[in-house]
Amino acid sequence: MTTLSPIEGMLQQLRGLAQTAAGTSSQAAAPAASGGFAGELQRSLSRINATQERAYGLSEAFELGKPGVALNDVMIELQKANVSFQTGVQVRNRLVQAYQEMMNMPV
């Protein structure tokens, strides 16, 4: 019975992540999101979003011709946003792969 406890804990975390991603988080999933893996994942997604918003804001400022905004700064910020987004996609892919492996484990 003790070997199932870690697996059940991981499944509960994945369910909490799925509910959070769907926007239907329950009160039980809220404590899990504040710390641990789920919390770190949420903070990472927030950082990716902030990087993209900063890059697109700088891009818009350049397009409007605001002084002090150079093209090379815009390109660097856009590449940073792209790299962070691609990293997030790879983390998601690994998470889905791990979930599928756990679901295919014999009990």
Curated annotation (Swiss-Prot):
NCBIfam families: fliE. One of its GO terms (cellular component) is bacterial-type flagellum basal body. It comes from Cupriavidus pinatubonensis (strain JMP 134 / LMG 1197) (Cupriavidus necator (strain JMP 134)). InterPro entries: FliE. One of its GO terms (biological process) is bacterial-type flagellum-dependent cell motility. This is Flagellar hook-basal body complex protein FliE. Belongs to the FliE family. The gene is fliE. PANTHER family: FLAGELLAR HOOK-BASAL BODY COMPLEX PROTEIN FLIE, PTHR34653. The keyword Transport does not apply. It is found in: Bacterial flagellum basal body. Keywords: Bacterial flagellum. GO terms for molecular function: cytoskeletal motor activity; structural molecule activity. Its main location: other.
